[in-house]
A protein has these predicted regions:
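Short, Lys/Arg-rich, polar N-terminal cytosolic tail immediately upstream
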Residues: 1-31
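A structural signal for multi-pass alpha-helical bundles of membrane permease subunits
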Residues: 32-312
Length: 312
């Protein structure tokens, strides 16, 4: 009777060891689910505390007025500063959103056609200004707009601005704030758009090149449609942030000692002004609700027209 010989499997023992280590590294499914529930609960809790609750309270303040239901909105609409504040913010956002959309998408498409290392260097350079956000960015621009201290003083003098107050004349404020917003925010969106372009299958781009499509046709007919949702996403967040413009005109107005920049240039500033100077929290809440409604309306239109949540 012959005894069957054991056949050695090359690397079998090593495979067993690797398998045992892999099994040891596996986490129970319950722990992953618990962690997921924890982070979702944390997000929902913070959203309710810092997002939903203030909105509900603002609506309550705006509607509960001793002079009658909705009188706070009437006061806000009748305020002589209401229309100019919204004209300012709409002019600013029109300049900023159009310029940001065209330049961010254009620069991203250009960087995507460059060599990997060269594109990485430019993405980093574009992203650097985003590190100076808020008041820090405005302080930088205080020097940039001062003809006596700016490194671009020759440009300011060429435009006819001999003093700081000339540069920040009321008619220049909307473009100035648009440049500030683009300076701090464009780099981050370029990185986001570049990541979206990298998700396009390389085979699709090769097929277009084989079919004779040049760089412009590839960008227009293939790349842009495939990153359309990211462009809409950028517009939604940018519009929501733009309606809340506050720091830039406040700091710039303080530096100019109130000359050229009013204390209620933007609706957000106006809401703060009536609340802090007149203790009229109901009107301030009404202005906040108007800004919220405007943001939600524009976001809904962009999401609907851009088919942001449709599966492809």
């Amino acid at each position: 009777m012959s005894v069957p010989s054991a056949t050695a499997v090359p690397g079998g023992r090593a495979n067993v060891r690797r398998g045992s280590r892999a099994a040891g590294r596996e986490r129970p499914a319950g722990s992953s689910a618990t962690a997921g529930y924890f982070f979702v609960a944390l997000y929902v809790g913070l959203l309710g505390l810092l997002g939903v609750a203030p909105v509900v309270y603002a609506i309550y303040l705006a509607l509960s007025n001793s002079r009658g239901f909705g009188s706070s909105f009437v006061d806000a609409f009748d305020d002589y500063r209401f229309v100019p504040a919204f004209e300012h913010i709409l002019a600013f956002m029109l300049i900023w959103l159009v310029a940001q959309t065209i330049l961010v998408v254009g620069l991203t498409l250009m960087l995507h056609n460059l060599a990997q290392r060269v594109g990485a260097v430019f993405r980093f350079l574009f992203y650097i200004p985003g590190a100076l956000a808020g008041a820090a960015s405005v302080v930088v621009w205080l020097f940039m707009l001062d003809p006596t201290a700016s490194p671009f003083a020759f440009v300011l003098h060429w435009l006819g601005y001999a003093q700081f107050n000339n540069a920040i004349a009321p008619g220049n404020l909307a473009p100035i704030f648009a440049v500030m917003a683009f300076w701090t925010g464009a780099g981050g969106w370029i990185v986001v758009m570049y990541g979206a372009l990298n998700n396009i299958p390389h085979e699709l781009l090769e097929s277009a090149e084989i079919d004779g499509a040049n760089a412009f046709k590839t960008a227009w007919w293939i790349k842009l449609p495939l990153i359309r949702k990211w462009i809409v996403y950028m517009l939604v967040l940018s519009f929501a942030g733009g309606t809340q413009l506050f720091v830039e005109p406040t700091v710039l107005g303080s530096a100019a000692l109130g000359v050229g920049v009013s204390k209620y240039w933007s609706p957000n500033q106006l809401a703060w002004f009536v609340a802090s100077q007149y203790d009229n929290f109901a009107e301030a809440a009404a202005l906040s609700v108007v800004l919220l409604g405007l943001g939600l309306l524009v976001a809904a239109i962009l999401v609907w027209r851009g088919r942001l949540f449709e599966a492809e």
